[in-house]
Amino acid sequence: MAPGCKSELRNVTNSHSNQPSNEGDAIKVFVRIRPAEEGARSADGEQSFCLSVLSQTTLRLHSNPDPKTFVFDYVAGMDTTQESVFSTVAKSIVESCMSGYNGTIFAYGQTGSGKTFTMMGPSDSDNFSHNLRGIIPRSFEYLFSLIDREKEKAGAGKSFLCKCSFIEVYNEQIYDLLDSASVGLYLREHIKKGVFVVGAVEQAVTSAAETYQVLSRGWRNRRVASTSMNRESSRSHAVFTITIESMEKSSETVNIRTSLLNLVDLAGSERQKDTHAEGMRLKEAGNINRSLSCLGQVITALVDVGNGKQRHICYRDSKLTFLLRDSLGGNAKTAIIANVHPGSRCFGETLSTLNFAQRAKLIKNKAVVNEDTQGNVSQLQAEVKRLKEQLSQFTSGQITPESLLARDKEKTNYIEYFLEAMLFFKKSEQEKKSLIEKITQLEDLTLKKEKFIQSNKMIVKFREDQIMRLERLHKEGRGSFLPEEQDRLLSELRDEVQTLREHVEHHPRLAKYAMENHSLREENRRLKLLAPVKRAHEIDAQSIARLEKAFAEVSSTETNDKGLQGFSPKALKESSFFTNTEKLKAQLLQIQTELNNSKQEYEEFKELTRKKQLELESELQSLQKANLNLENLLEATKVCKRQEVSQLNKLHAETLKIITTPTKAYQLCSRLVPKSSPEVGSFGFLCTESSSRLDNDILNEPVPPEMSEQALEAVSEELRTVQEQLSVLQVKLDEEERKNLKLQQNVDKLEHHSTQMQELFSSERSDWTKQQQEHVTQLSDLEKQLQDAQTKNEFLKCEVHDLRIVLNSADKELSLVKLEYSTFKENHEKELSQLSERHVQVQLQLDNARLENEKLLESQACLQDSYDNLQEVMKFEIDQLSKNLQNCKQENETLKSDLHNLVELFEAEKERNNKLSLQFEEDKENSSKEILKVLETVRQEKQKEMAKCEKQMAKIQKLEESLLATENVISSLEKSRESDKELVTNLMNQIQELRISIGEKSETIATLKQELQDINCKYNASLADKEESKELIRRQEVDILELKETLRLRILSEDIERDMLCEDLAHATEQLNMLTEASKKHSGLLQSAQEELTRKEALIQELQHKLNQEKEEVEQKKNEFSLKMRQLEHVMGSATEYPQSPKTPPHFQAHLAKLLETQEQEIEDGRASKTSLQHLVTKLNEDREVKNAEILRMKDQLCEMENLRLESQQLREKNWLLQRQLDDVKRQQESGDQSHPDSQQLKNEHEEIIKERLAKNKLIEEMLKMKTNLEEVQSALHSKEKACHRMSEEIERTRTLESRAFQEKEQLRSKLEEMYEERERTFLEMEMLKKQLEFLAEENGKLVGHQNLHQKIQYVVRLKKENIRLTEETEKLRAENLFLKEKKKEF
């Protein structure tokens, strides 16, 4: 910047509002054009500019042959004020920092383009209070005003901590400006903090004034120096960082937000030929240009990465780019101010700055809120649970406002239909993808099979060719082989051919694939024929049709309901859709698993039912047979019983007869004799003789009665034993019959099963017979083939000998081939190892070549950019020089014409002199004295003319010298152009050499790629044998993974179902609790709500009255302001009507000062009204807290009433029990069964019951009263809730009014700042006008003193020209003033 330009940079008002763009987190680029200095005017009074502003977002660069147009986010002209720049650029960044985002603002441009003035302001005054202060002081003011506003709104629940650090990057070293004793600091990187400076001082600040003190203290330590382009040129990059930490407490949780605001003043790029830097300044300029070129390379790489290219971003090549890494391509919102110089001599730097800004505009960052939540773990868990429940309630549609319930109910069906349609669409897409994958796999499988079959066919063909060759050899040399050898050879070869054919035709994988394919087709056909699958398809088709119909209806009705807006915000809708989709996905997985399980269960059930049906049929037939057998047995048993009864009757009659006959008695007697005399046993012979003699005597004797009784007893005992034995045998017989029945049933089952098996066997026998017949036919065919083979064998036996010889030779060749193959395999393995090593080396070389190629491309791009800039600069300078040359030629022509006129005057004077001399000679004699006088006057005039001629000749010599100087300048410019051409040719040669080297390297890369492809082909060929086994393993792994996946899905579906059930249970319990709490709340807010309503209504009326008063005052102030502006316009108009007056109106300055004082007083009044409104809002908040406490107290009272209600219920139950006991006692008294003490006890109990009944009646009355009170409280609570809702709406409205008033206040403040800047500008212009008037007064005095008429005329003409110029300037200023007033009226 030229000397003194930083302090003399003037701006005028530009009424652009701060309209944030909706381009996400893209880097915002703003261009500011600095005004040209006063010394940059040409000879004709006009300035030579290379820029022109077309609109607020576009500017034009006057390049040759065609001008270039650039588009940016905002273009600030030469008359833009500091306040408009701040409101456009920095306000949104500061507000985002208050919201928790990182923000960065930095100025870029050449040296002397106004970067420091834009960021800081004038350098020779107090920047913090100056009207022309820059972005950094204004950012401090706005930041702390926002902090104070947040503190007033939140009270003690929110606190802020601001810390400042100030560093500079000087000669690629980092220094701390707040610590003058610091040496080179280091940069470090942290995962959360990002890039930071180790050891930098951070100072806490609490106000904008403290922050500015820290800034000014560090600014004094910054390195600045003077150059030919700027009086105070920044020699380092300065970064001022403000760390903003906000801590918000809510119950037991603490929400912490941290953000960084980086304010960067970059050093300007410069050229040595412009700044004439030497020594240390030249080294500093080299480091500055190097860091700025690294910044340009980083931005180019970021643009390429944003366009999808793979590029390395060289952040670490410079300390500046590494420090600004997050600001350029990370977590920050960034604004770049590109400062440019409009002068034509800065065309090259202006063009490079605009190209840099245009590239930076394409970068997009990803800014996020830096937020951390701390607090009690249980409290956080409860908060998370509450939010989840609220989210579930929102998604389920339970929490909806009363005004939108109907619309939400109408939309639920549409949402469900839409989600189902999306699920069907996703399902169809997934099925389509799976089918496409299966098709591709099957195609790959068929290709592999075809390749395998072709290879095997080729092997068979080679073998057959070998056999044909051996046959031909055998025919040529018939009889050389023995018949046994020929047979053996032929049989071996035939066997080999047959095995190969079988290998081709009956490959196990082919058979496996065919079987799998067939089974899959059968399974698919069977599943399609199942009734559930058909039903599912039909249901899907019906649901799709229903969804399409519903979607059409909703889409038709949605156009009619566009005016209505949903209550739930977009985030809630998205969350509800997300949760619904998750639940529907889980349900879909569950239904799919259930479908698979039902299919499996259906198959198992089908098999079981078939088996059970067979068993039941067999059991039925066996039971039928058993039933018939049992009926037969029953009839047989009846017949047997009849026979047994008849036999028993007969036996009984016979026993009676036997008992009554004497033979029986005799037998009894004979049985009793040996019992009575046991000694007779030794004398058996004598007894027999005696018994034979006594037979007749015993028979004739009568039977004694004792013996008959004994005989009866013995018979009865024997009958009893027989009956017992009979009963035991009967039981055994029954058991045997049951066993026989069971066996018979089993036999029947087995017979039925055997019949079924026989039927199966018969069907199988028929099949077997058919197969046997087929085998017989095949056997006959095989016999025929055997006969043919025998004939062929006989034919081929003659060739066996030759084939054996050939086989021996083939074996020898095979052994040689095996040896060659082993050696080839070893060599191949060695080559593979070498090729793998070479592959690695080639890959490394390729990577190195790629990196070198990228570097060369980057350098080529940089050279191309510099070449283009040089071309543009050269064209622009050539154009300027050609214009200067034309001007010089025109001046030379004018000087030549003036010289010719002077020569003609000189000749005329000579002729006059000659005439006078002749006249003198003629009149010499007549009037010598007069002639002498005349001669003397002529001589004087001649001397004057000669002096004039000498002056003209001196002017001519000066003009010739200037012409020679211009010619020398032109020659030097031509030489510089030739040197530039030589530089351009050198650059072109370098580019050509680089292109040649790139071509050579690309050729080497191509050869390396070809070698790499050959190596890959060999490597792939060597690995082809391993792919089949890997494929089998992969398939097995895929099967295992599929089984695991199905198991995991089943487990997941069960877990999801369990979680859903748990959530439903928790939701139901929560709803129950909420209902109970709501009933409690509704019962306790009557009196407080009424008082609150009356108070709030009065307060609202008071606030509305004050608001109306404020609006009237604002309108009155606006009217006064417009009136004063009209007065100012009138004063300015009166000032411009008299441009030649040497004095200004005396009352103008005082009137303007009074006007500004009144405006300041009005602003102070507005601030006071704002503070009073804020106090009212705080009072309202305090009242609200008091009412919340009263609500809590009423809740406690409601809890007590609920406890009383429970106690009354318990007493009612006790009363009922006692009433029953009393009734029992009365019944007992009436019966009279109880004794006297019991009756006394009953009397006591009766008295107690009476007392309890009275107490119960009292409690019932109190309960009824409480119920009535509760109903009244509930009704009052309902009305109070409505009032509270109205109050909350009123509070929201007051908040919006407060925010609107804050915005209006900020707009008024910015307008006031612009007015201050305009006042400064008008004061400066008035001073200039005063100086001009004083100068005119002096010149007027001089004009009065002049006596020569020619001089007076020239002076008056010059004054008229000056007067015309001044009137034109005043007209321009008046037009600008009118334009600004119209803009203000629009606001």
Curated annotation (Swiss-Prot):
User: Which UniProt keywords are present, listed alphabetically?
Assistant: Acetylation, ATP-binding, Coiled coil, Cytoplasm, Cytoskeleton, Microtubule, Motor protein, Nucleotide-binding, Phosphoprotein
Looking at the record, the residues that make up the Kinesin motor domain are 26-363
What CDD domains does UniProt report for this protein, alphabetically?
KISc_KLP2_like
- The Polar residues compositionally biased stretches are 10-22
Write down which residues bear the modification named N6-acetyllysine. Answer: K1009
The protein's GO terms of the molecular function aspect are: ATP binding; microtubule binding; plus-end-directed microtubule motor activity
Subcellular location(s) of the protein: Cytoplasm; Cytoplasm, Cytoskeleton, Spindle
Main location (coarse class): cytoplasm
The residues that the entry says bind ATP are: G109, Q110, T111, G112, S113, G114, K115, T116
What Pfam families would the database entry show?
Answer: HMMR_C (PF15908), Kinesin (PF00225)
Check the record and name the SUPFAM superfamilies matching this protein. P-loop containing nucleoside triphosphate hydrolases
The entry's note on the tissues where this protein occurs is:
Expressed in brain (neurons in the external germinal layer of the cerebellum and in ventricular zones) (at protein level). Expressed in spleen and testis.
Q: Which residues form a coiled coil?
A: 368-1132
Superkingdom of this protein's organism: Eukaryota
Signal sequence range: none
Q: Kindly list the positions at which Phosphoserine occurs in this protein.
A: S568, S1141, S1169
Region feature Disordered, mapped onto this chain: 1-23
Q: Which GO terms describe its cellular component?
A: cytoplasm; microtubule; spindle pole
GO BP annotations, alphabetical order? centrosome separation; microtubule-based movement; mitotic spindle assembly
Identify the InterPro entries for this entry. HMMR_C, KIF15/KIN-12, Kinesin_motor_dom, Kinesin_motor_dom_sf, P-loop_NTPase
Q: Which family does it belong to?
A: Belongs to the TRAFAC class myosin-kinesin ATPase superfamily. Kinesin family. KLP2 subfamily.
> What is the annotated role of this protein in its UniProt record?
Plus-end directed kinesin-like motor enzyme involved in mitotic spindle assembly.
Quaternary structure per UniProt?
A: Interacts with MKI67 and TPX2.
Question: Under what name is this protein listed?
Answer: Kinesin-like protein KIF15
> What is the originating organism of this protein?
Mus musculus
